[in-house]
């Protein structure tokens, strides 16, 4: 299961962007190890109260509401348990959203303070990929070009792939204007207790609300594998604060979810982090961070308790490259920065076309208030200096809008002659248009 490198250069110029997109398209052609059986989104994790029973017509949501709740994580709040169907929402925004924000802010601060790009980000125990959806628009700010996600639960992973794909599609326009290189988001089926070389030496590993789902000895083994074998530059993980269950009206000793194997109180979690600091001195491990607070219960700190571990010395894994037990089952592109790239490429193509064309050699039309020329925008797009795979993503009408903007509306759109065209008034010289374009920047 050896895979080609997923990395590409830093976003210094248009050519780097274009080459990155070309490499992304090549990476997306790489065959998967296998394809997951598609899980039913409408039956997605019915144990959470906000996801209604799909057979309950009275409470059934339409597809748009279902997608909305799934995408914005309203349906996967840790405060919603099997035994408390009528419980109110304790957290605004939902606790899952707050955890995602904590990860985003922590990674942003790490990038700022270390001046190191988080080029490869791994999510271990990714579940339904709430975190990936929550931070995808910030990946450019992190300097990320590759996200690797792994989970052992295939239905959850299938749901995650569907929801992430839908999220990327719905937010394509927002992502297109974000600064950053395109991001390859790959998903794997695997047991996080088994280290995989592809997850070694990454810049960041995140594992939120995962360890409590496996027996405590295995949870400790997982964390020790990350800090001692995979050795990311930063490792963030969280688990429920057991003391906070009292806020939800739960009985002493009752776990927040039926599938939790253990839960720690604040003292137990703090002691665990102190033990890790002694065993792995090459990591600086913060005191516990707390996420999610309900008014009136400030004395309990927060619903989730998180650890942040930063590598202090430049060490590399000793895990052999052939150790790749995970199966690659999905990949999706997060097309950051594509609009800026397209704009700059169209600008270069338009300038190149203007330099080479002699407007006066073409007979102007005189059926308007001023003589003018009409040109098919395809003639301009033929001057694009980009691989065909990327050039084909630039819509002709969008290219015309770019040209209108960069010429300060001295060029007009024309769609009534059977093609997508531009109109140039004879009063505007080629030299004037070139200067206007060169003076305008996006």
Swiss-Prot record:
Tissues where this protein is expressed: Broadly expressed in the germline and somatic tissues in both hermaphrodites and males.
Keyword Magnesium: yes
Record EC number: 2.1.1.386
Gene Ontology terms: cellular component: cytoplasm; nucleoplasm; nucleus; perinuclear region of cytoplasm
Location relative to the cell: Cytoplasm; Nucleus, Nucleoplasm; Cytoplasmic granule
Domain of life (superkingdom): Eukaryota
Cofactors required: Mg(2+)
Cofactor binding note: Binds 1 Mg(2+) ion per subunit.
Primary location class: cytoplasm
Family: Belongs to the methyltransferase superfamily. HEN1 family.
Protein role: Methyltransferase that adds a 2'-O-methyl group at the 3'-end of PIWI-interacting RNAs (piRNAs) and small interfering RNAs (siRNAs) which are classes of regulatory RNAs that are involved in gene silencing in endogenous RNA interference (RNAi) pathways. Methylation protects the 3'-end of small RNAs from tailing and trimming and could constitute a recognition signal for appropriate argonaute machineries. Methylates and stabilizes 26G-siRNAs (a class of 26 nucleotide siRNAs that possess a monophosphorylated guanine residue at the 5'-end) when they are bound by argonaute protein ergo-1.
The protein, known as: Small RNA 2'-O-methyltransferase
Organism: Caenorhabditis elegans
UniProt lineage: Eukaryota, Metazoa, Ecdysozoa, Nematoda, Chromadorea
The gene coding this protein: henn-1
């Amino acid at each position: 299961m050896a895979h080609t490198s997923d990395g590409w250069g830093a976003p210094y110029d248009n050519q780097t962007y274009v080459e990155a997109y070309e490499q992304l398209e090549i990476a997306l052609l790489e065959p998967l190890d296998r394809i997951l059986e598609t899980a039913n989104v409408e039956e997605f994790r019915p144990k959470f109260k906000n996801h209604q029973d799909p057979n309950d017509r009275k409470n059934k949501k339409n597809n748009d509401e279902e997608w909305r709740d799934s995408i914005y994580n309203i349906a996967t709040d840790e405060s919603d348990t099997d035994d408390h169907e009528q419980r109110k929402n304790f957290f605004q925004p939902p606790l899952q959203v707050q955890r995602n924000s904590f990860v985003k802010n922590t990674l942003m601060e790490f990038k700022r303070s270390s001046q190191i790009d988080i080029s490869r980000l791994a999510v271990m125990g990714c579940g339904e990929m709430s975190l990936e959806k929550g931070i995808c628009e910030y990946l450019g700010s992190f300097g990320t070009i590759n996200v690797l996600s792994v989970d052992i639960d295939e239905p959850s992973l299938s749901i995650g792939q569907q929801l992430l794909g839908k999220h990327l599609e719905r937010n394509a326009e927002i992502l297109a204007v974000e600064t950053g290189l395109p991001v390859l988001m790959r998903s794997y089926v695997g047991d996080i207790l088994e280290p995989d070389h592809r997850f070694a030496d990454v810049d960041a590993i995140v594992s939120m609300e995962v360890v409590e789902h496996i027996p405590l000895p295995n949870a400790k083994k997982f964390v020790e594998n990350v800090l001692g074998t995979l050795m990311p530059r930063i490792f963030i993980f969280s688990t429920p604060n057991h003391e906070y269950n009292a806020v939800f009206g739960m009985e002493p000793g009752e776990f927040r979810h039926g599938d939790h194997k253990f839960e720690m109180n604040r003292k137990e979690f703090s002691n665990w982090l102190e033990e890790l600091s002694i065993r792995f001195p090459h990591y600086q491990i913060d005191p516990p961070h707390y996420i999610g607070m309900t008014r009136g219960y400030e004395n309990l700190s927060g619903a989730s308790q998180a650890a942040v571990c930063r590598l202090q010395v430049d060490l590399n894994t000793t895990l052999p490259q052939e150790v790749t037990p995970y199966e690659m089952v999905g990949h999706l592109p997060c097309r950051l920065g594509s609009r800026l790239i397209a704009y700059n490429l169209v600008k270069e193509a338009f300038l190149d076309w203007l330099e080479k064309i002699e407007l006066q050699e073409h007979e102007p039309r005189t059926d308007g208030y001023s003589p003018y020329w009409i040109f098919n925008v395809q003639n301009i797009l033929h001057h694009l200096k980009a691989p065909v795979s990327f050039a084909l993503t630039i819509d002709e009408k969008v290219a015309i809008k770019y040209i209108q903007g960069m010429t300060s509306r001295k060029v007009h759109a024309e769609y009534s002659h059977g093609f997508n065209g531009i109109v140039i008034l004879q009063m505007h010289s080629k030299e004037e248009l070139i200067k206007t374009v060169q003076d305008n920047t996006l």
